[in-house]
Amino acid sequence: MSILLSAAVSLLSASALAVPNASPGKDASKMTQIQASSFARLALKAVQKEYPNKPEHVQNSDMDVRGPRALHPAFYGSFDWHSSVHGHWMLVRLLRLFPDLPERQQIRTMLEGHLTAQNLQAEADYFIQPNRQSFERTYGWAWFLKLAEELHGWDDPDGKRWSSNLRPLTDTIVARYLAYFPKQTYPIRTGVHPNTAFGLSFALDYARAVDHKPLQDLIEERSRTYFAKDAAIPAAWEPGGTDFFSPSLMEADLMRRVLSPKEFQAWLRGFLPGLENGEPKTLFVPAQVTDRSDPQLVHLD
């Protein structure tokens, strides 16, 4: 279930549903309510399903030998923490886009039970325990800030309360960004979770949405430092065997946010020469998945 949810969220976030400053009214035209209901049912089942679960958990003592729900009372469901977080984001987004969604009350009931002040404080407390400074860095961090951004922009009484409840963990993750990225000398260009461009993209969206100038300035500076001089990326080598990102397109997706339109056009021509002619072909042809039951190979789907 969590693998299918990841695929669903990838589709949603690649569409207008995750475009910064997008209008819910305009976004809704890109998806039917029947499709939205299908995604909603998928996520509702996943975020309330505790097992199977693959925790990224450092145990500091015997007291830390606990199950997912005890460790993460808000985000225990799905295969891992970040999948639970982006499942919650998708459900909030669907509520905003489709206020008459048949599953709307189920979604609100679940969110009311998960996104309590007590649960979110426990999630924040988990982050600050010893030896957990790299927990979910930066994929889970980015998805949590996307959830925080979604709730921040929602004019809804429940949404405002849930947004407030997120604040302890939101502040913790923002502080992690501000502390970590000045120390990361080189970007991570992998096609999976640690991808630096992805981690910066969603965080930049959040920073701009809430007008967090220090975070915005840091991300824009780091993005230019890491990527502004890149040219002729070997995108023909993509995809890697277990990628769910295109490293080249993810980098371009970040730089379109950072550069002016004129700068970006010039940068993209040098970064992906031949793109306007359909080259490299690997970026235009779906990857082949030989075994969808394999949790790594299915990343390609």
Predicted regions and their residues:
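Low-complexity, Ser/Thr/Pro/Gly-enriched N-terminal "stalk/linker" regions
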Residues: 24-76
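Bacterial N-terminal signal peptides
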Residues: 2-15
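HEAT/HEAT-like alpha-solenoid repeats
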Residues: 41-44, 48, 52, 73-77, ...
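Structural helix-adjacent loops and short alpha-helical linkers that scaffold large soluble proteins
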Residues: 26-36, 52, 94-109, 151-170, ...
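Extended ligand-binding groove/face enriched in aromatic
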Residues: 69-73, 85, 92-207
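Solvent-exposed loop and edge beta-strand segments that line ligand/cofactor-binding
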Residues: 28-33, 68-85, 125-142, 183-196, ...
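Boundary at the C-terminal end of the N-terminal hydrophobic targeting segment
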Residues: 14-22, 252
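Long, repeat-rich segments with strong aromatic
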Residues: 208-301
